Structures are given as C-alpha cells and as structure tokens.
Amino acid sequence: MKSSIIKTGTMLAGFLLAACLSTHAEIKLPAIFSDGMVMQQQTNANLWGTATPHKKVTVTTSWNRKQYAATADKNGAWKLTVATPEAGGPYTVTFDDGTQKKLNNILIGELWLCSGQSNMEMPMKGFKNQPVENANMDILHSKNPQIRLFTVKRTSTFTPQNDVVGSWKEATPASVRDFSATAYYFGRLVNEILDVPVGLVVAAWGGSACEAWMTADWLKAFPEAKIPQTEADIKSKNRTPTVLYNGMLHPLIGMTMKGVIWYQGEDNWNRAHTYADMFTRLINGWRAEWKQGDFPFYYCQIAPYDYGIITEKGKEVINSAYLREAQAKVEHRVANSGMAVLLLSLIHISEPTRPRLI
C-alpha cells in the first residue's frame, strides 16, 4: 500500500513538473541566427524567433551593451531590430525571457545571399570530371575566420516553411571544399577589397528553374507556369513553380543583408521569350518581401554551352543567345542590378575534364 502511494505521488509530481515546464517555452531562433553568424554592418538588423506566448523577450548586444525588447504574440512569435556598428567582432547577442540564450562569435560586416542553380551550387571541390581551376591551392590557403559560410540544405515543399537546415562555418579548407565556388570567390574578393568580415548564405539547387524561386502570385502573369495545387503535383523537386521559394527562400526573408548574387538561367534557356519579364518579377518580388529597398542584385550571364547536347532528338535546338538577350534587358529595367558577362569564359565546354569554373 505504501509503495503504491509513493508511486502515485511520484507520477503526480512528474505530471505537475511537466505541466509547469510546458508553460514556459524555450527561446528558439531560426538556424540563420546562430553561433558564428555575420550580421550586416551599420544598419538596423532584424532578429526574430519564438518564445512563451505573451512573454517579454529582451535582446542585449555586446558591441554597444544596449537592450532591446519585444513581446511574443499569442503564437509565441516575436521580432525586433538591433542597431549594428561598423564592421568588427567577435561579439555576442543574448536573448532572455526569463531563461537566457546566448549567441557567440558573431561578426559584423557584409552579408550576401547567393542563389541559383548548379553554377552557384557547384562546390570548390568540383563535380565529377568538372574541376574548379586552381581550386586545390585556393582550398589549401582558404583559412580565414573573417569569412563565414552557410549552406541552406536542399528543400522542396508545397507550403512556405519558417526555417532552413544549415549552420555557420568559418572558412577553412574543410568547409570551403564543400562550399559554393562562385559564392566563395565572390566573398573572398569582397573581404580582400573592403577588409571586413563577409557572410555568405547559399540557397541554390542545380537544374532549378526561375519559376521554382517565385510565389504563385508573382507567376500569375505567366500562365504556362503550372502552379502545384497538391503535393502530388510536384513532379520535379527543383523545377516545379514555387517549391524552392517555399522551402529555401521564404525562411530567409527579412534577414538583413547587403544584397544578392544570382547564377541561374540555364534551365530557362528554352523559355527565353518569358525570361526577361519573369526574372524582373522575381527581383521585384524578393525586394518587396524583404522590405529593404532596392538592395544590390547582381547576376551572371549564362556561359557558353552547346545546348544541342541536352535537346531531345528531333527537336529544334534553341540558340542560347536569346536567353542572354533576355538577361541583358533586365539590368536596364531594374535599378541597382548588374550582369557579369561570361560569354568569353570556358565554364561549360565539351571536354569532360576541363575546368568548369574559372
């Protein structure tokens, strides 16, 4: 009898403890806000997350010892902005709603989003039989704590997500070899020229269509873009309209940054007649959702390639110059944008072991 009472009391105590703990939700932050991150310098940078509903959340930044506060809504969501200084660090940011959470080793500098398809996704170590020129030496000498890397895991979804899978890493031979070559070389140059920390967030998927990085609303002007109505309509994880916006871009929207670099267009080579309008809509859409004005949006002209290699037998080979023409139109339509001309490069060539990126 006595043991039964003790057992019952223990179970009741455990239940009450669990109930008490469940009423106080731990502060949770998106993966992009984590140890080792880079925040954009000299601005009001967004931070957000979840906590106990209706609970006050305070954020303290070590660079100025200021405290900022927000109140979580009924769903536990909160958001605020913090003033960032000139480039520097490392710093800490402390979150508190009764229980503290601290982010360490934070740098302030230039933060860039890098997106597109395979020429953006391709790592420094290269693809099979497609090495990156000079990559071995560049990887060997890549250690630089001022350059931070974040790769968004490939994610294709029917509905918009609130977080991504990924983590911040300092530039070292081990991290750089698996990181986007295009993004790394861009970031390395920015770091060398400006002598400030650089953060690079890569959200890219080889073979992805422009339509996959857009919302259904933006695509209304393009009836040939078939918007999935159910999960079953997603026939291609990287080409179906909206799916990469939902899974890889939507969670990042609002991340205060310097700008975007974009390398995509190859998948749209046979739909060049719509690309200028579609790409313009993508840029305007991203800027509207970010609410950060006309941030820089730089993109790469598609490189030379014999598209006859991938054209179905019996079908007309469409000249890729039409897509380049469409790309060229965009920088004249869109403020604060620019195109890197690659027509004379040897990125896509027929010899199987020649470098793909130069």
Show the residue positions of the predicted features.
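Structural beta-strand segments of beta-rich domains
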Residues: 43-47
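Short, solvent-exposed loop/linker segments at the N-terminal edge
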Residues: 37-41
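Surface-exposed loop and adjacent secondary-structure segments within mature catalytic domains
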Residues: 122, 128-172, 194-244
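Bacterial Sec-dependent N-terminal signal peptides
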Residues: 1-26
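Extended acidic/polar, glycine-enriched regions
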Residues: 48, 54-123, 127-130, 195
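Alpha-helical scaffolding within the catalytic cores
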Residues: 239-251, 277-285, 317-329
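Single conserved hydrophobic/aromatic residue that forms the stacking wall/gate
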Residues: 347-358
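Loop/turn elements at helix/coil->beta-strand transitions in domains of secreted/extracellular proteins
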Residues: 110-111, 145-146, 194-199, 255-259, ...
